[in-house]
From Swiss-Prot:
Gene3D superfamilies: Vaccinia Virus protein VP39
HAMAP family: tRNA_methyltr_TrmB
Function, in words: Catalyzes the formation of N(7)-methylguanine at position 46 (m7G46) in tRNA.
GO molecular function list: tRNA (guanine(46)-N7)-methyltransferase activity
Name assigned to this protein: tRNA (guanine-N(7)-)-methyltransferase
Enzyme class: transferase
Amino acid sequence: MTESHDTPITSDGEARPHRRIKSFVMRAGRMTEGQQRGLDQGGPLYILPLADSPVDYDQVFGRSAPRTLEIGFGMGHSLLEMAAAAPEQDFIGVEVHRPGVGALLNGVLTQGLKNLRVYDCDAIEVLNRCVADNSLDRLMLFFPDPWHKARHHKRRIVQLEFAELVRRKLKPGGVFHMATDWEPYAEYMLEVMSAAPGYRNRAADGTYVPRPEERPITKFERRGERLGHGVWDLKFEKVD
């Protein structure tokens, strides 16, 4: 999710404010009964509104605990599994795909989880408007759209500007964890993050970390394994 550098000019010669290029496409999708239940019953309890000032998440969760935010949780399987496995931590998921939000919330209701909240809007807006600086222990970005074609690379969410936004929101020592099943995108993310100031690559060899135990195996990973693809994990720690 990066900014366009083209500034449109109006007919009277004045420059219009440029629009930010989004890294996602809104997809229509039918709701299952369970997904609709999640939205109807879980939405009022667990979907957070987009705020105009930093949110006090200690108040939202009723405690102070290590906090993880995931961007683009898809259908929510991994986030649900991680939240259930770590009840002593708090999790915030951001996803614009409504069936995915419904599926996650249905799981939250079914499992009775209390340590998970959701935003159903643009993650950049959430980070800019709702998340205080130096407040996150971890930010996760698993299997983002790689935008394969060269002309679409500007739509990739991992850009220097985004890396700086994430760095501001992480606590010192906080970790930005990325994963992809497309090697050219892994190489691209490694290049961007290696050039981003204020980070340290946690990989011993300066490339990719071994598959972390805390990241559940996703459908993307299983698909990649069937196709003979690998999965690349990157972990960059905020150092200042």
